[in-house]
């Protein structure tokens, strides 16, 4: 566990939770998938978050996933966990994260309730102050804090970043320009590569990458082209890979998670196209469409051409 008060930067890994056909967590597969992300150069691991089906995990499974992530990372990159939901569970899982050696956590929305700004502030503050771990706010769904509330939270040294999942660019510009480098700014929109051309210029130069779970070298090519001003390559990858995959993602609710698993299975990685309800597995026809996209992507952008 590191005490560095800084949000992770770059392409951030969000591993899925690999379940077998009976719905049991496959620990060895999770370890191998995390090692794959690290071998491909991802700058951090965010375990048991949205992509890891946080909402479906038991406390025992959560502990297992955190232990595996910390072991796989072996101190080479920071490990962040997902905490949130009802407050008592969030505090328990924050404590578990600290005990298991994580570096920080991503604070997910409270369960069900649409609170007032003061209530959301108190919810977030309580979790942040409960441990000495780094904390990242996640703006999404029923938990969207205003500039005023986030400025109040910056008084807490544990707060190191903000991840946006709503796409309110006016708010994002206000946040990043007003608060500046006091926080790290993360793009957490579904299929974040889609919006990175808009986010990077306003300081959101880090992002959670779904496709890095199965074609990380292409995500890396896109990211480096974006930062280096290679507009031709950005446009090409955008049109040939990112938009086609995103069009499939939008076909069903829950595909933001299950399409990752389908892509990993197609690419021969250690996961099956299974998910826990209410998320549904990817339908066969959509799997075939994704397979064709990936086949063409690998032919056009073979791994040896990636700048890793």
Swiss-Prot record:
Main EC class the enzyme belongs to: lyase
Matches recorded under CDD domains: KDGDH
Entry's EC annotation: 4.2.1.41
Entry-linked InterPro entries: Aldolase_TIM, DapA-like, Dehydro-deoxyglucarate_dehyd
Single GO term (MF): 4-hydroxy-tetrahydrodipicolinate synthase activity
BP term (GO), one: D-glucarate catabolic process
Pfam families in the record: DHDPS
Keywords: Lyase
Catalytic reactions of this protein: 5-dehydro-4-deoxy-D-glucarate + H(+) = 2,5-dioxopentanoate + CO2 + H2O
Coiled-coil boundaries: none
Pathway: Carbohydrate acid metabolism; D-glucarate degradation; 2,5-dioxopentanoate from D-glucarate: step 2/2
UniProt xrefs under SUPFAM superfamilies: Aldolase (SSF51569)
Family, similarity comment: Belongs to the DapA family.
Protein name in UniProt: Probable 5-dehydro-4-deoxyglucarate dehydratase
């Amino acid at each position: 566990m590191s005490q560095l008060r800084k949000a992770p930067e770059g392409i951030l890994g969000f591993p899925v939770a690999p379940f077998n056909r009976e719905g049991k967590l496959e620990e060895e597969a999770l370890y191998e998938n995390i090692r794959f992300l690290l071998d491909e150069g991802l700058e951090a691991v965010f375990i048991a978050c949205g992509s890891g089906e946080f909402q479906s995990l038991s406390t025992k499974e959560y502990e297992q996933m955190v232990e595996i992530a910390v072991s796989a990372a072996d101190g080479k990159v920071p490990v962040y966990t997902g905490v949130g939901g009802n407050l008592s569970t969030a505090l328990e899982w924050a404590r578990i994260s600290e005990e298991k050696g994580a570096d920080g956590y991503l604070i997910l929305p409270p369960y069900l309730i649409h609170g007032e700004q003061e209530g959301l502030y108190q919810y977030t503050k309580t979790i942040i102050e409960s441990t000495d771990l780094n904390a990242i706010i996640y703006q999404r769904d029923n938990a969207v804090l205003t500039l005023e509330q986030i400025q109040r939270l910056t008084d807490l040294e544990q707060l190191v970043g903000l991840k946006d999942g709503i796409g309110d660019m006016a708010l994002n510009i206000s946040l990043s320009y007003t608060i500046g480098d006091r926080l790290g700014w993360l793009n957490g929109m579904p299929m974040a590569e889609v919006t990175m051309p808009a986010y990077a210029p306003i300081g959101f130069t880090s992002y959670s990458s779904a496709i890095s779970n199965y074609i990380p070298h292409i995500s890396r090519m896109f990211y480096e082209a974006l930062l280096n001003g290679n507009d031709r390559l950005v446009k090409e990858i955008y049109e040939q890979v990112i938009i086609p995959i995103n069009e499939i993602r939008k076909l069903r609710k829950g595909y933001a998670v299950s399409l990752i698993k389908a892509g990993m299975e197609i690419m021969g990685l250690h996961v099956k196209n299974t998910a826990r309800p209410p998320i549904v597995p990817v339908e066969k026809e959509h799997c075939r469409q994704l397979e064709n996209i990936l086949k063409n992507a690998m032919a056009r952008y073979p791994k040896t051409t990636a700048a890793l």
